[in-house]
Amino acid sequence: MASKKKKIQVTIELKTREELNPYLAPTYPKVVIVDGYHPFWGRCDVAEIMLKRFQEEPANANKVDWLSIPYEQIADIVPKEKNEKGEVIEVGSKPKYFIFVKGEFFVSINGIDLPKLREEIYKSYAKFEETTN
């Protein structure tokens, strides 16, 4: 009988704002990246592989927590993005990541753009260090 491989999960799955609040405390010791997903579409499982590889890199060890929560639980604490016509862009099937540093919103990234995500994460590390010293 073949054994099933256990899936190693990188993302901490949350359902409510109350579960998220401790991660957004000004004293939280890591950068926090939130996948704010639309409940109909769900989390982006494809991104999990990239996140796992990213977190395994020594430079990133113990510096970041990846969270996943339905967008409506964070809609009031993240800025609304607008298109060229000034219309609010709703969260849909494309992943949307929000980075927080010491409880403050830092930046959002649309889609699975790993180079852009890495760039913004490294900027958030610098901001974290700047506010720690």
Task: Describe every region a protein language model picked out.
Residues 90-133:
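Non-catalytic, surface beta->alpha helical segment in thiol-disulfide oxidoreductase systems
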Residues 33-37, 99:
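Structural cue for short, hydrophobic secondary-structure segments
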